[in-house]
């Protein structure tokens, strides 16, 4: 049986916290898991958090430096589109999963759309009142499937014109992590 190849895109510790639970629940006998590590993960000034992502031993990792400390968002976006587009043309994923409203997710969504690769946007439909909201809604429109955290977000995505059958309310992905015993007693 051929395994389905799924790429997860992560640019920050925060989005990886949301994606890690989804990565863990995938059956290794059915899915080949790949993690595209970029963004703030790669910068020492943000703690070089790529080291945390690399602890996922049952997933393949690729690292892509998409920015220097003083790069503007448009520069980061264009570098990430080019790097991620090259990557998906090489690995030919069946599906790409990204989270939220960051420039790395926008770049992945654009690369998937222009290369006809199916994609999933996690936590679209949220409101922030910042530039990130524009990114989030753009990412939603570029995505094929949507995993949302509440009915309000689902309704916003439907108002954007997306097919209700492609929107699944899964709740907030990191709640599963927080519901487990951390080993720390109070």
Label for each model-derived stretch:
Residues 9, 42-44, 142-186:
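A nucleotide-sugar donor-handling region in carbohydrate enzymes
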Residues 32-76, 83:
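Conserved nucleotide-sugar phosphate-binding/catalytic loop shared by glycosyltransferases and other
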Residues 111-125:
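Active-site proximal beta-strand in glycosyltransferases
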Residues 128-144:
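A conserved, positively charged/aromatic
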Residues 25, 108-112, 138-139:
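Hydrophobic/aromatic ligand-binding patch that stacks against planar heteroaromatic rings
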